[in-house]
């Protein structure tokens, strides 16, 4: 069923494909245009450089009049990211405008990585390290970057484990005695 929100999301997707912003990518899930997977590459010359951070964007039928929920799936150590992965970003709350699209949301999140708002932290520990012990903050961020490279490996291992479990189940079926 085509709704204004779904039509707008398809326009956003088309724009992402025709004019992809640097360092970000996103696409709707194959079976649900209201949920998108996204990846942000950590900006050059920042502690986040070369990180590959996965996010999930969840839209409802109020989009673009209401912002999506944006959540890091990858581990993220940042003053404006809650432990749950949820973001504290003004354009996703009180400064939302229907003129924002998926591309502008992701580029805003990308720029937030190196320019946190420490006056309103979601992660107090990260904010305090950023303010008072920058070298420790950078060290923790670099660990997060390294972990982001393993996210894909973890997913592949989980898929392999699931495949092996299915194969074992198939073997068990072969051993059933029929009377």
UniProtKB/Swiss-Prot annotation:
<dbReference type="GO" id="GO:0043161">
    <property type="term" value="P:proteasome-mediated ubiquitin-dependent protein catabolic process"/>
</dbReference>
<dbReference type="GO" id="GO:0005524">
    <property type="term" value="F:ATP binding"/>
</dbReference>
<dbReference type="GO" id="GO:0005737">
    <property type="term" value="C:cytoplasm"/>
</dbReference>
<dbReference type="GO" id="GO:0036503">
    <property type="term" value="P:ERAD pathway"/>
</dbReference>
<dbReference type="GO" id="GO:0042276">
    <property type="term" value="P:error-prone translesion synthesis"/>
</dbReference>
<comment type="similarity">
    <text>Belongs to the ubiquitin-conjugating enzyme family.</text>
</comment>
<keyword id="KW-0804">Transcription</keyword>
<dbReference type="GO" id="GO:0003697">
    <property type="term" value="F:single-stranded DNA binding"/>
</dbReference>
<dbReference type="GO" id="GO:0000781">
    <property type="term" value="C:chromosome, telomeric region"/>
</dbReference>
<feature type="region of interest" description="Acidic tail">
    <location>
        <begin position="151"/>
        <end position="179"/>
    </location>
</feature>
<feature type="domain" description="UBC core">
    <location>
        <begin position="4"/>
        <end position="150"/>
    </location>
</feature>
<dbReference type="InterPro" id="IPR023313">
    <property type="entry name" value="UBQ-conjugating_AS"/>
</dbReference>
<dbReference type="GO" id="GO:1990305">
    <property type="term" value="C:RAD6-UBR2 ubiquitin ligase complex"/>
</dbReference>
<keyword id="KW-0833">Ubl conjugation pathway</keyword>
<dbReference type="GO" id="GO:0006366">
    <property type="term" value="P:transcription by RNA polymerase II"/>
</dbReference>
<dbReference type="GO" id="GO:2000639">
    <property type="term" value="P:negative regulation of SREBP signaling pathway"/>
</dbReference>
<dbReference type="GO" id="GO:0071596">
    <property type="term" value="P:ubiquitin-dependent protein catabolic process via the N-end rule pathway"/>
</dbReference>
<dbReference type="GO" id="GO:0006353">
    <property type="term" value="P:DNA-templated transcription termination"/>
</dbReference>
<dbReference type="InterPro" id="IPR000608">
    <property type="entry name" value="UBQ-conjugat_E2_core"/>
</dbReference>
<keyword id="KW-0749">Sporulation</keyword>
<dbReference type="GO" id="GO:0062040">
    <property type="term" value="C:fungal biofilm matrix"/>
</dbReference>
<comment type="function">
    <text>Catalyzes the covalent attachment of ubiquitin to other proteins. Plays a role in transcription regulation by catalyzing the monoubiquitination of histone H2B to form H2BK123ub1. H2BK123ub1 gives a specific tag for epigenetic transcriptional activation and is also a prerequisite for H3K4me and H3K79me formation. Also involved in postreplication repair of UV-damaged DNA, in N-end rule-dependent protein degradation and in sporulation.</text>
</comment>
<dbReference type="GO" id="GO:0006974">
    <property type="term" value="P:DNA damage response"/>
</dbReference>
<dbReference type="GO" id="GO:0090089">
    <property type="term" value="P:regulation of dipeptide transport"/>
</dbReference>
<feature type="compositionally biased region" description="Acidic residues">
    <location>
        <begin position="149"/>
        <end position="179"/>
    </location>
</feature>
<keyword id="KW-0227">DNA damage</keyword>
<feature type="active site" description="Glycyl thioester intermediate">
    <location>
        <position position="88"/>
    </location>
</feature>
<dbReference type="GO" id="GO:0097505">
    <property type="term" value="C:Rad6-Rad18 complex"/>
</dbReference>
<feature type="region of interest" description="Disordered">
    <location>
        <begin position="145"/>
        <end position="179"/>
    </location>
</feature>
<dbReference type="GO" id="GO:0017116">
    <property type="term" value="F:single-stranded DNA helicase activity"/>
</dbReference>
<keyword id="KW-0963">Cytoplasm</keyword>
<dbReference type="Pfam" id="PF00179">
    <property type="entry name" value="UQ_con"/>
</dbReference>
<dbReference type="InterPro" id="IPR016135">
    <property type="entry name" value="UBQ-conjugating_enzyme/RWD"/>
</dbReference>
<dbReference type="InterPro" id="IPR050113">
    <property type="entry name" value="Ub_conjugating_enzyme"/>
</dbReference>
<dbReference type="GO" id="GO:1990303">
    <property type="term" value="C:UBR1-RAD6 ubiquitin ligase complex"/>
</dbReference>
<dbReference type="GO" id="GO:0009302">
    <property type="term" value="P:sno(s)RNA transcription"/>
</dbReference>
<keyword id="KW-0067">ATP-binding</keyword>
<dbReference type="GO" id="GO:0061631">
    <property type="term" value="F:ubiquitin conjugating enzyme activity"/>
</dbReference>
<comment type="pathway">
    <text>Protein modification; protein ubiquitination.</text>
</comment>
<dbReference type="GO" id="GO:0000724">
    <property type="term" value="P:double-strand break repair via homologous recombination"/>
</dbReference>
<dbReference type="GO" id="GO:0070628">
    <property type="term" value="F:proteasome binding"/>
</dbReference>
<dbReference type="GO" id="GO:0000209">
    <property type="term" value="P:protein polyubiquitination"/>
</dbReference>
